[in-house]
Amino acid sequence: LNGKKVVSKKVEGSLVDIDHLTPDADFMKTFATQFEQGKKFTNDLVGKSQNTMESVPAFFGPSAFIDFIHQMQLQIGKAEVSFAAPLAMDAVIPEGNIYVRDMFNLYRYENLLYVMNLTGQEIKDYLEYSYSGWVKQMENKDDHMLLFRDNPEQYADAWQRFQRPSYNFDSAAGIRYTVDLTKPTGQRITILSMADGQPFSLTRTYRCALNSYRGNGGGGLLTQGAHIPESELTKRIIWSTEKDLRYYLMQEIKKQGTINPKPLNQWKFIPEDWAATARQKDEPLVK
């Protein structure tokens, strides 16, 4: 304060443990009906899965977890290429019954699904930017593979160990490509073909499925990576869902009844022996 005038201020927040507190009885009584309705909804059966889906493997290559989302996005959006990232560090959806509550592990945020027009060059640049924040340039097979902060072991929570948020680690489906861990940023991605073996062209325009956070510029993959001006992003959108993506994922699972999620194996890190060795070192730091 300078007299009665505020000249500067600083606000800090922190998480507070409230487990030891007793909930207010009037509050609990007032909202008891809504609480029971919400609990019933999250316990509703959506379908069944023949395999366990985990998010941790997604940091090291194709995974059933992310590739199921890719498959759904390609199908729902009638797209040629899909982009998706692990939205949770340690999500697990066990084999067996899938309930509504599990869908919040599979897809945490209230994003719409967009389909946007991107050129082949923009797709490559998008992926270069994604992996630039995901993996480091390895000098030998004993290096870390993931782009951690210095001394990652000092951080208690796995998400704090990364230099960039893991929800910006987009991989792609619909195309076959490699990510060279020995190359610098901008030279890592080699797109071999479309997933069906058809040629991939840097000059052709493709229908690309991605969530609305990403499509509106979130994470910078479109603006800083693909070099699309923010003012142009809305012009690239050619289709959008009306409801959140989780709703459509639920509808697809209900429609199929039983799903069998497996990795699509459309991309990989190379050299493969370096990636395998680095995974043994890095995976404990992701859990």
Question: What is each stretch, according to the model?
Answer:
Residues 1-287:
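Catalytic centers of hydrolytic enzymes
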